[in-house]
């Protein structure tokens, strides 16, 4: 049963960012508390990003809602997430997309996220321990690709794994700031469709740990 606290959190998000009905329903369906480390459970329904292990963070629920909506979610089937983290973003995506694939480079985070998602019965979410810069070629092409970490550029491997006409949303490092950009794939290349807003994400890092 969805908690009143989670509902009120979604109300607060909606006041700041007008939510697509599908995004609001997805956010209300997933209890953020499940993904928050025990010392921070009392902050689970605030709009703050919260610390996890390995110098990583669970994103603000406002950010999760925005990133989900920026994907343009109507009439889509599959999404690839780069940077699973706690699994919260993937869980929200699972309420909208038929198939969710998420790659995590930190093994301890991968194991915890996979267990959380399994315990929630989210059978349409598939998580892989791997270098996110290489994507997940096995199930490509994807209708959407979402970066949950900040990239300096988009690797060719991920462009290749995006469906022609598909959308990729990513925080991009530009000089001394990060901005969220939405790209569309046209003629096998990415074109910036829209610069959405400034942001603050942990960086994409090569390799695994």
UniProtKB/Swiss-Prot annotation:
Catalytic center residues: 59
Molecular function terms from GO: protein-L-isoaspartate (D-aspartate) O-methyltransferase activity
UniProt cross-references to SUPFAM superfamilies, sorted A to Z: S-adenosyl-L-methionine-dependent methyltransferases (SSF53335)
Subcellular location: Cytoplasm
Disulfide bonds: none
EC number from the UniProt entry: 2.1.1.77
Record-linked PROSITE patterns: PCMT
Example of a GO cellular component annotation carried by this entry: cytoplasm
Gene3D superfamilies, per database record: Vaccinia Virus protein VP39
Entry keyword set: Cytoplasm, Methyltransferase, S-adenosyl-L-methionine, Transferase
Aminoacyl-tRNA synthetase in keyword set: no
Reactions performed catalytically: [protein]-L-isoaspartate + S-adenosyl-L-methionine = [protein]-L-isoaspartate alpha-methyl ester + S-adenosyl-L-homocysteine
NCBIfam families hit by this protein: pimt (TIGR00080), PRK00312.1 (NF001453)
Stated family: Belongs to the methyltransferase superfamily. L-isoaspartyl/D-aspartyl protein methyltransferase family.
Function of the molecule: Catalyzes the methyl esterification of L-isoaspartyl residues in peptides and proteins that result from spontaneous decomposition of normal L-aspartyl and L-asparaginyl residues. It plays a role in the repair and/or degradation of damaged proteins.
Protein name: Protein-L-isoaspartate O-methyltransferase
Species, as recorded: Helicobacter pylori (strain G27)
The encoding gene: pcm
